[in-house]
From Swiss-Prot:
Keyword annotations: Chromosome, Coiled coil, DNA-binding, Nucleus, Telomere, Transcription, Transcription regulation
PANTHER family: SINGLE MYB HISTONE 4 (PTHR46267), SINGLE MYB HISTONE 5 (PTHR46267:SF25)
Superkingdom of the source species: Eukaryota
Gene Ontology biological process terms in this record: nucleosome assembly
Name of the protein described by the UniProt record: Single myb histone 5
The protein's assembly and partners: Forms a homodimer and heterodimers.
Gene Ontology MF annotations: double-stranded telomeric DNA binding; protein homodimerization activity; single-stranded telomeric DNA binding
Function: Binds preferentially double-stranded telomeric repeats, but may also bind to the single telomeric strand.
Domain notes: HTH myb-type domain confers double-stranded telomeric DNA-binding while the H15 domain is involved in non-specific DNA-protein interaction and multimerization.
Family annotation (PROSITE patterns): H15 (PS51504), HTH_MYB (PS51294)
Amino acid sequence: MGAPKQRWTSEEEAALRAGVARHGVGNWRMILNDPELSSTLRYRSNVDLKDKWRNMNVIVTSSSTRDRGRTSTRRTRAAPKNNDQLLAMSTITSEVDDEIVDVKPIVSMSVEGWNTSNSKKSHSRLDNIIMEAIKNLNEPTGSHRTTIANYIEEQYWPPSDFDHLLSAKLKYLATSGKLLKVNRKYRIAPSLLEDVQREPLKLGSDASRTLTRSQVDAELVRMATMTVEAAAAAAAHAVAEAEAIMAEAEAAAREAEAAEAEARAAQAFAEAAVLTLKNRNAAKLV
């Protein structure tokens, strides 16, 4: 286990804000290498900066009564104006920094539209994202799971259990014949490759859309100028979306496990059939 992460200091938060103002959202490595900021942020990584910036700009309300009570108290305060608005947002989010839920949605969707049929569509979109990664990587011998994961993480905001979800999806796609797995590398099946090249992947629909990192960063900047009430409402919606993504991940894992069980049963049946045939041939020879 690594060393426990230290709580962010006010100097580090100020340095992060200055770095974002100077280099822009998403340029975490440039911020860490900035001569004026590197000494203050020397104990922080790219991921630390990304997560902290997201937490500083999104207020997430938990389901406990205590948190709801605290949120209600904040909402009774007069809404700040102009520049005081951003300062109030930063102060409040700093107070609840340790209680903020790590929300990293890979797909944004309306909660009302989340049902069984939409769950199947979401699975299809995740399949397409994996297909897109393998197609764009275009490696002759196929792409390793780590390479696929890195590509998706660069293009989208994956959920916290992304590794488990990706492994389950790759196993399911390989079992169903959509992907070929050779030496731990994945390639698109030849029968599907022509369809993928002929028809562009459609990752969105009327009920949902896939957000890239740049779009998410732009959304966070927009949320920084919201009132406390509007930001709290948006954060609550983000929590609901994250819960929907978790439900999707669990369903995908169950689907992959079911497919694996079917494959094992089919293999056992085939082995039993071969053994029966051998026994019959042996009996005839006797």
